């Protein structure tokens, strides 16, 4: 395998080319990309955890340092002003020397407000990309060039197509997340609480709660029916029935996003349903290829959900086609089949149809689908089907013409298990689909 340094060199060349094209299209001279700043909690002197500007970490794997600036023009070597204060109160990251620093000019910035004297004097034609518009105005950036929509749309669109460097980083993030999932399953099997399972996960991945790309979903029993459950009970339930873990990791700013569901017992209806959802998820991935709309795969999985609802006698006396047509599958899988993945967990440009930002919304029937793109080589997406037993979604179906088709007794028996979700991260290639998650033997 090529070294990360050589992959990064090619990555920078790709970003430079995209930058040249964007600057030419929008008649700008350069982009000033801001890592961000610390923001204090209201009426307090403690800051919120720092989260870096994604457009900044696209260029350099600097994810923990505020007050950094990157100047890029697509021609000259990118110039990074790295915040390096004299500070005995806080940890100060040293000036980086790593695989990537040969391809970027790195300059120490001792004072956060010192960037103004270091930038080119003529700034009227420089675009600012970052979270603090008032800072850009103070630096003399034209208001119309602060987070210009056309430039950002252009860059976002092409972020969908991962470079080999980005894919290498994402495979490393997968390894970390897989280690965490294995540790979490072991903790579940030993009877730990959600809180302690989360600690086991973080320890295995080498992350803190503020390092993971999203808040871990560690859901025992009926908590698995809450799609984004993040409470973390300190006490283990008296009876362990099920465990849904949706948790990721980050490497050089790139995310993994995995979900697994386990049954405490291997010989009940729920355990068989978990196995069947897993099998159908793999079967769907086996059909995926470039040139097909992501929406089609979402719709296809509703047909697979119908098959499982019929097999497990959760819905009875109705064809699978009628279940999908009348949206009886909807309350059981209320979210989309997945989303783009990359520098952000819900990565950008899921609805963009071209580099001008043309938006194609999700179908009205499936409003929570996060991607309507035609799959193309270089895209990375999650595939995360599920079946859940959520009373607020099932309640409207307890009345009306279709109520008789719901096996309410079976549904009540499954509700204490919460739900099921199985999520892998896949890469679209020209002639195949790479399943980064299963390649690491995560069952």
UniProtKB/Swiss-Prot annotation:
**What InterPro entries does the entry give?**
Creatin/AminoP/Spt16_N, Creatinase/aminopeptidase-like, PepQ_N, Pept_M24, Peptidase_M24B_aminopep-P_CS, X-Pro_dipept-like, X_Pro_dipept
Any GO BP? proteolysis
EC class, as a word, reads hydrolase
Cofactor(s) needed by this chain: Mn(2+)
Write down the chemical reaction(s) this protein catalyses.
Answer: Xaa-L-Pro dipeptide + H2O = an L-alpha-amino acid + L-proline
Co-factor note (free text) = Binds 2 manganese ions per subunit.
Concerning biotechnological or industrial application, the UniProt entry reports: Can be utilized for the kinetic resolution of racemic phosphate esters.
Please list the GO terms describing molecular function: aminopeptidase activity; dipeptidase activity; manganese ion binding; metallodipeptidase activity; phosphoric triester hydrolase activity; proline dipeptidase activity; protein homodimerization activity
The EC number on file is 3.4.13.9
Q: Which GO terms describe its cellular component?
A: cytosol
In which residues is Mn(2+) 1 bound? 257, 339, 384, 423
Gene3D superfamilies (UniProt xref): Creatinase/methionine aminopeptidase superfamily, Creatinase/prolidase N-terminal domain
Q: Which residues bind Mn(2+) 2?
A: 246, 257, 423
UniProt keywords, alphabetically: Dipeptidase, Hydrolase, Manganese, Metal-binding, Metalloprotease, Protease
Q: Which PANTHER family match?
A: XAA-PRO AMINOPEPTIDASE 3, XAA-PRO DIPEPTIDASE
- Family assignment from sequence similarity: Belongs to the peptidase M24B family. Bacterial-type prolidase subfamily.
Extra notes?
A: Has a stereoselective preference for isomers with R-configuration at the phosphorous center of organophosphonate diesters and with S-configuration in organophosphate triesters.
Task of the protein: Splits dipeptides with a prolyl residue in the C-terminal position and a polar or nonpolar amino acid at the N-terminal position. With much lower efficiency, also catalyzes the stereoselective hydrolysis of a wide variety of organophosphate triesters and organophosphonate diesters. Is able to hydrolyze the organophosphorus insecticide paraoxon and the p-nitrophenyl analogs of the nerve agents GB (sarin), GD (soman), GF, Vx and rVX.
* Entry protein name: Xaa-Pro dipeptidase
Species the sequence originates in: Escherichia coli (strain K12)
From the UniProt record, report the name of the gene that encodes this protein.
Answer: pepQ
């Amino acid at each position: 395998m090529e070294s990360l340094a050589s992959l990064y060199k090619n990555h920078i060349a790709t970003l430079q080319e995209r930058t040249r094209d964007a600057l030419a299209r929008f008649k700008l001279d350069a982009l000033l990309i801001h890592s961000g700043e610390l923001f204090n909690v209201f009426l307090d002197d403690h800051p919120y955890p720092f989260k870096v500007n994604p457009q900044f970490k696209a260029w350099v794997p600097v994810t923990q340092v505020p007050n950094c600036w990157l100047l890029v023009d697509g021609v000259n070597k990118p110039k990074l002003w790295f915040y390096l204060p004299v500070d005995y109160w806080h940890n100060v990251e040293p000036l980086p020397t790593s695989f990537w620093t040969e391809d970027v000019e790195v300059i120490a910035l001792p004072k956060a407000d010192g960037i103004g004297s270091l930038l080119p004097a003529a700034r009227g034609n420089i675009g600012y990309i970052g979270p603090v518009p008032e800072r850009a105005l103070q630096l003399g950036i034209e208001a119309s060039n602060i987070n210009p929509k056309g430039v950002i749309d252009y860059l976002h669109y092409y972020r969908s197509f991962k470079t080999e460097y980005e894919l290498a980083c994402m495979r490393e993030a997968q390894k970390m997340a897989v280690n965490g999932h294995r540790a979490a399953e072991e903790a579940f099997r030993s009877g730990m609480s959600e809180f302690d399972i989360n600690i086991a996960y973080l320890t295995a991945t080498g992350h803190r709660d503020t390092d993971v790309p999203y808040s871990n979903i560690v859901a025992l029993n009926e908590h698995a029916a809450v799609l984004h459950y993040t409470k973390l009970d300190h006490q283990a339930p008296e009876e362990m029935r099920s465990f849904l873990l949706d948790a990721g990791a980050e490497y050089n700013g790139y995310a993994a996003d995995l979900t697994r569901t386990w049954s405490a017992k291997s010989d009940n209806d729920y355990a068989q349903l978990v196995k069947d959802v897993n099998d159908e998820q793999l079967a769907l991935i086996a059909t995926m290829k470039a040139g097909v709309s992501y929406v089609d795969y979402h719709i296809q999985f509703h047909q697979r959900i119908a098959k499982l609802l019929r097999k497990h006698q959760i819905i009875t006396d109705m064809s699978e086609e009628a279940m999908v047509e009348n949206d009886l599958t909807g309350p059981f899988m209320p979210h989309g089949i997945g989303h783009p993945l990359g520098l952000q967990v819900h990565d950008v440009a899921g609805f963009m149809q071209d580099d001008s930002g043309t938006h194609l919304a999700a179908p009205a029937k499936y409003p929570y689908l996060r991607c309507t793109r035609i799959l193309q080589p270089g895209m990375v997406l999650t595939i995360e089907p599920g079946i859940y037993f959520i009373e607020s979604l099932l309640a409207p179906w307890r009345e009306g013409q279709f109520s008789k088709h719901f096996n309410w007794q079976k549904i009540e028996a499954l509700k204490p298990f919460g739900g099921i979700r199985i999520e892998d991260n896949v890469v679209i290639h020209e002639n195949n689909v790479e399943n980064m998650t299963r390649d690491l033997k995560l069952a």
